[in-house]
Amino acid sequence: MEQSQSQRQAWPSSSAGGGKAQDSGVLTREDFDGGPVSIDEVDTGLFLGNLTAATHMETLRSFKITHILTLDSVPLPQHILEASFLTTKYIQIADMPREDILQHLEGCVDFISSALAQQGNVLVHCYFGVSRSSSTVIAYMMKRHNLDFLPAYELVKAKRRFVQPNAGFVSQLKLFRRMGCKIDPNCQRYKIHRLRLAGEQMRKAKILPQSFHSVVRPDPDITRENPEPIVFRCRRCRRVLASKSHVLEHKPRDRPPQEVVPKEKEEVAAAKLPAQSHDQAENHHGARMLEQLSERIRQSSLGSPGHESTPNYCRSILFVEPIAWMHRIMLNTQGRLYCPKCEQKLGNFSWINACKCPCGETMTPAFYLIPSKVELSKAVQNVQTTV
């Protein structure tokens, strides 16, 4: 039996969770009340059903089931797992909107595709066959028939009328489709999805679990393999802080996108502005300069097919991914960001609270750099030149 990457914990035999502890110390599903057998053929050889169907040997033989994909809190009973005519795969997941079903979809779709390619019959099930299992079947239908979420959902619902993925799973299915029915680590929405999951863990544990350490990107000042050509540096000491791919772009919300203002018009506009404090003027100038520089290098720096670029994106605040040089971000829920070289304050971070940009957009979790504290540079053949 194939297992998900998450580890299952041993439960005592007296647990009320509907499972029975085996000698191996692994909880399996033995006692349950999932109602009568419920199973429907959604596509040729692909069946969607409930736990009762997956544990009823006569049903499995009647529908000539050869493969079972289980999405539940515990695995199937041992006598099903040991059946010689069955190949099984188990994903440990609860039916909750904040559960990360997205990380499993690609593997589940591959399992279904492989089984059908062998002329087998696949049963995908959870407890009632309503949310977790239907989400997986919808993901398969999206990829198999090149469908967006809604047509795939309606196709499955036409075969099994009471399917209903929870709201969190629906959002993740739409993201799965946006990424081409695969995990694209360069997709900005996927990055934000992973950050939000990590933020939930930080809220509970006050420390970043090892399973989420990958959301913290390597330090670009140390990385020497395939360095990115566009970087952000500390304005004071010119230490590399972030690469262009680390930036989480956003559109202005409360004001319309502004075009880059030509220098001569900029000077006239500046003459009409009321007097500002030094910090206000510095921040305004820094954000404006970043907008101009980003516009000039946009085509050369956004060449990655997985990068989602939005025209006229805001630079009032520079939201970035968490990066390894950010001191103690794995051990604190929020704090300030300082340059690791000159110790100048560069911005702030929070895993648990939203940060609102002056444009009106919010980001949660938020790791941001103050535009006036950094500068955009372009590297040419390992020689850094300020644009």
Curated annotation (Swiss-Prot):
Keyword Transcription regulation: no
UniProt keyword terms in alphabetical order: Cytoplasm, Hydrolase, Nucleus, Protein phosphatase
Reactions the enzyme catalyzes: O-phospho-L-tyrosyl-[protein] + H2O = L-tyrosyl-[protein] + phosphate; O-phospho-L-seryl-[protein] + H2O = L-seryl-[protein] + phosphate; O-phospho-L-threonyl-[protein] + H2O = L-threonyl-[protein] + phosphate
Subcellular localization: Nucleus; Cytoplasm
Top EC class, one word: hydrolase
Active site, UniProt feature: C126
Highest taxon of source: Eukaryota
Tyrosine-protein phosphatase domain ranges (all copies): 35-182
Regulation: Inhibited by the tyrosine phosphatase inhibitor sodium vanadate.
EC number(s) recorded for this UniProt protein: 3.1.3.16, 3.1.3.48
GO molecular function: phosphatase activity; protein serine/threonine phosphatase activity; protein tyrosine phosphatase activity; protein tyrosine/serine/threonine phosphatase activity
Segments for region (Disordered): 1-27, 248-267
Keyword presence, Hydrolase: yes
Biological process according to GO: negative regulation of MAPK cascade
Biased composition (Polar residues): 1-15
Purpose of the protein: Dual specificity phosphatase; can dephosphorylate both phosphotyrosine and phosphoserine or phosphothreonine residues. May suppress bsk/JNK activation during the immune response.
Subunit structure: Interacts (via tyrosine-protein phosphatase domain) with bsk/JNK; the interaction dephosphorylates bsk.
Name of the protein in question: Dual specificity protein phosphatase MPK-4
Organism of origin: Drosophila melanogaster (Fruit fly)
Source species taxonomy: Eukaryota, Metazoa, Ecdysozoa, Arthropoda, Hexapoda
